């Protein structure tokens, strides 16, 4: 499927300040960038680098006043995600080096505190994909999707207590529960077609059966039509904007449309 994805951010700056964005989709095996535009108003210099997770980051020094960022991409992506209940657990000693970091606790994913819950959810299941899907289903069933009940400091352990959150919180809890079972799991941010209400979205991938599989605890089924922007251990690694001065995000607009 071809998708046209777009995002506009409008900032008001009270001072000149550095700003780092993560808004450009990745170009790889699962998705191909066919067209892309990245426009700043005013037209200030931008440099780009690749972070340690392979994400594209746009770095700039924004000036006092209004800054508008418009990014648009046409992307060829997968209409469905792969489902494979035969994908088994990969012993730690057999994991690829790059997967190890996604097995450890992180800022928002206190997997060391959640082993008992992870074991309770997955006991008597085959090791691997079936465990991850059981975790996804448990979070979808037991956590209420609700805006305004969590904040940027809310962690996976917090969500177990409050049982409310948004896609970022659902994802953090799934990550922590998978890692508690020594299953590498990483956060993914990007776009999802037909998401309601439309916004940038977060989901996760787990490493079982010697590859990464996609899961989303906010959805009823394994839906495709996703465009990946970035990967990380948790939200700390994949913020769409990291600001280093006195500025305010006054407007944000996101769009995902199918291209016939």
Label every PLM stretch briefly.
Residues 75-79, 97-165, 173, 235, ...:
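Secondary-structure boundary elements
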Residues 28, 88-104, 155, 222, ...:
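Flexible glycine-rich active-site/ligand-binding loops centered on an Asp-His dyad
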Residues 77-92:
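Ordered, amphipathic secondary-structure segments that act as subunit-interaction surfaces
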């Amino acid at each position: 499927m071809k998708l046209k994805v777009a995002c506009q951010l409008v900032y008001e700056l009270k001072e000149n300040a550095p700003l780092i964005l993560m808004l450009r989709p990745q170009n790889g095996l699962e998705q191909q960038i066919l067209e892309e535009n990245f426009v700043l108003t005013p037209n200030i210099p931008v440099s780009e680098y690749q972070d340690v997770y392979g994400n594209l980051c746009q770095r700039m020094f924004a000036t006092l006043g209004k800054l508008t960022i418009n990014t648009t991409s046409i992307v060829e992506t997968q209409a469905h995600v792969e489902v494979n209940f035969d994908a088994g657990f990969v012993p730690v000693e057999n994991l690829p080096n790059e997967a190890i970091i996604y097995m450890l606790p992180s800022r928002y994913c206190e997997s060391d505190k959640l082993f008992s819950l992870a074991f309770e959810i997955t006991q008597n299941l085959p090791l691997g994909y079936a465990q991850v899907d059981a975790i996804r289903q448990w979070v979808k069933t037991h956590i209420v999707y609700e805006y305004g009940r969590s904040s940027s400091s809310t962690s996976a352990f917090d969500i177990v207590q409050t049982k409310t959150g948004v896609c970022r919180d659902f994802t953090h809890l799934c990550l922590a529960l998978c890692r508690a079972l020594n299953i590498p799991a990483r956060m993914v941010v990007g776009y999802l077609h037909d998401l309601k209400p439309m916004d940038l979205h977060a989901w996760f991938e787990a490493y079982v059966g010697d590859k990464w599989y996609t899961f989303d605890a906010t959805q009823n089924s394994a839906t495709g039509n996703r465009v990946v922007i970035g990967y990380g251990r948790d939200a700390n690694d994949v913020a769409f904007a990291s600001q280093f001065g006195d500025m305010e995000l006054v407007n944000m607009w996101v769009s995902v449309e199918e291209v016939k």
